[in-house]
């Protein structure tokens, strides 16, 4: 394809992975990183690919969705996974790393690549083009650049994420839950309802108020939007606030009794197949341990709940990707701009790296005049892509960042008894489907990371 040149803005997990993949594809890369001249409040190290909040890339077990993503990225020659394997520290089946060695190794490999030039500068405006640029500036994108991205996104740029817990459908006690949309609107099975009597509601509110909360980072001022307050903050405003807010029972009579409960927790279908449900309005800063305990102990129908995702609220600059980005992760309004990483609405180190890999691959295809070939839907990479395009979610879904979870995958066919069997089936199907996608254009054999 000749010596094309692209710009990658941001040297985190997504930007580093993308820069490596592009360079391995024969493209000259200018990687623009604001450190060490300027840092976000969360960063300490001078190097690229700094792990901020944890040194863990989570489970390396390929029968978990994130472990399957690890496996796929290794097969694709991921720099991030190669560096993680080389700097691994003991952590059971989790892939945990020595942060400083990991960052130093990624930095060294990128600086040592003949087609990569690292420029240390803070970018304040989006490049005008016509050259291709990948924006991978992360959840703490600087104010000036964020304002430019917001203008591009037409208001579809969010500055905090408000994530409610998601529960596996088959762990909900259906002898307690009932299907009903408020006032009978919509298709009834889009929502499940968990009814409370007054005593159960009072006990639940008390548990929320007493529950242990996550302390905010120094760079996260606890300023909340009124439309997405943490449930415990609403509970602090008055004993009945939740019963008139996200837990209001109006229009949700129990069809088995014909009576209206004192309060309800509504569960909204999270995926098309109905394998997971979101606890509506339950964004929270309770610790994950407390979320599990309180929701299982105090919410009728969730005693045996298995959580696909737990709730959180934190500073996180992210685009409403399904509406702002095309399927190849380029901006619909300015196609020379591509986006990757947490700014697109993926959550987690590995997911960010995977998104960077996908964007780089799309850019290589654009430069070569080829159509972008998305990853197969049943792979972990494909599941993330389905999230970014909105394909994994039902109509009207409130787009929020997510980790890779099996709820994003297309439903399995056939019978699979038990959770372990379903995970095995997902993994085996993904392995078969990823193989022909790894190198469809016969240009990624050189994509393997250097030792």
From Swiss-Prot:
Where can this protein be found? Cytoplasm
Single annotated GO MF:
tRNA (uracil(54)-C5)-methyltransferase activity, 5,10-methylenetetrahydrofolate-dependent
The Gene Ontology CC terms held by the record are: cytosol
Which residues are involved in binding FAD? Answer: 10-15
- Reactions catalysed according to its record: uridine(54) in tRNA + (6R)-5,10-methylene-5,6,7,8-tetrahydrofolate + NADH + H(+) = 5-methyluridine(54) in tRNA + (6S)-5,6,7,8-tetrahydrofolate + NAD(+); uridine(54) in tRNA + (6R)-5,10-methylene-5,6,7,8-tetrahydrofolate + NADPH + H(+) = 5-methyluridine(54) in tRNA + (6S)-5,6,7,8-tetrahydrofolate + NADP(+)
Q: Which cofactor does it need?
A: FAD
Keyword set for this entry? Cytoplasm, FAD, Flavoprotein, Methyltransferase, NAD, NADP, Transferase, tRNA processing
Which coarse location class describes where this protein primarily resides?
cytoplasm
Q: Which InterPro entries match?
A: FAD/NAD-bd_sf (IPR036188), MnmG-rel (IPR002218), MnmG_N (IPR040131), TrmFO (IPR004417)
Q: What is its EC number?
A: 2.1.1.74
Q: GO biological process annotations for this chain's record?
A: tRNA methylation; tRNA wobble uridine modification
State the superkingdom: Bacteria
The record, for Pfam families, names: GIDA
- Describe the family membership recorded for this protein in Swiss-Prot or TrEMBL: Belongs to the MnmG family. TrmFO subfamily.
PANTHER family in the record, alphabetically? GLUCOSE INHIBITED DIVISION PROTEIN A, METHYLENETETRAHYDROFOLATE--TRNA-(URACIL-5-)-METHYLTRANSFERASE TRMFO
HAMAP family assigned: TrmFO
Functionally, this protein is described as follows: Catalyzes the folate-dependent formation of 5-methyl-uridine at position 54 (M-5-U54) in all tRNAs.
What is the protein named?
Answer: Methylenetetrahydrofolate--tRNA-(uracil-5-)-methyltransferase TrmFO
Q: Which organism is it from?
A: Anaeromyxobacter sp. (strain Fw109-5)
């Amino acid at each position: 394809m000749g010596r094309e040149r692209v710009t990658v803005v941001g040297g985190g997990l997504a930007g580093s992975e993308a820069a490596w993949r592009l360079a391995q594809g024969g493209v000259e890369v200018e990687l623009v990183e604001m450190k060490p001249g300027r840092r976000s409040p969360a960063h300490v190290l001078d190097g690229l690919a700094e792990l901020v909040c944890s040194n863990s890339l989570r489970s390396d077990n390929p029968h978990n969705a994130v472990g399957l993503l690890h496996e796929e990225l290794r097969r694709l020659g991921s720099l991030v996974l190669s560096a993680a394997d080389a700097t691994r520290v003991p952590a059971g089946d989790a892939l945990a790393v020595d942060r400083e060695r990991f960052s130093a190794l990624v930095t060294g490999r990128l600086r040592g690549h003949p087609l990569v030039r690292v420029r240390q500068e803070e970018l304040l405006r989006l490049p005008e083009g016509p050259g291709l640029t990948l924006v991978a500036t992360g959840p703490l994108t600087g104010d000036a650049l964020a304002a430019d991205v917001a203008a591009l996104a037409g208001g579809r740029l969010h500055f905090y994420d408000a994530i409610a817990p998601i529960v596996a459908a088959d762990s909900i006690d259906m002898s307690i839950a009932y299907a009903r949309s408020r006032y009978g609107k919509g298709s009834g099975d889009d929502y499940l309802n968990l009814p409370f009597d007054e005593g159960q509601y009072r006990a639940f509110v008390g548990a929320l108020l007493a529950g242990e909360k996550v302390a905010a980072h120094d760079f996260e001022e606890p300023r909340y939007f009124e439309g997405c307050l943490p449930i415990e903050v609403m509970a602090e405003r008055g004993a009945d606030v939740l019963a008139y807010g996200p837990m209001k029972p109006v229009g949700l009579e129990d069809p088995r009794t014909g009576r209206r409960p004192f309060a309800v927790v509504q569960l909204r279908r999270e995926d098309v197949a109905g394998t997971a449900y979101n606890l509506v309005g339950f964004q929270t800063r309770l610790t994950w341990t407390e979320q599990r305990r309180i929701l299982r102990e105090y919410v009728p129908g969730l005693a045996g709940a298995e959580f696909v995702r737990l709730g959180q609220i934190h500073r996180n600059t992210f685009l409403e990707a399904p509406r702002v980005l095309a399927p190849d992760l380029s901006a619909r309004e300015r196609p020379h701009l591509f986006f990757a990483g947490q700014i697109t609405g993926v959550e987690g180190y590995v997911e960010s790296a995977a998104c960077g890999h996908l964007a780089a691959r799309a850019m290589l295809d654009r430069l070569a005049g080829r159509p972008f070939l998305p990853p197969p839907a049943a792979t972990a990479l494909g599941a993330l892509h389905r999230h970014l395009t909105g394909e994994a979610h039902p109509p009207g879904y409130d787009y929020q960042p997510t980790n890779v979870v099996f709820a994003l995958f297309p439903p399995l066919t056939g019978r699979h008894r038990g959770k372990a069997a379903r995970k095995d089936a997902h993994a085996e199907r993904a392995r078969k489907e990823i193989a022909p996608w790894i190198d469809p254009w016969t240009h990624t054999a050189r994509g393997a990371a250097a030792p």
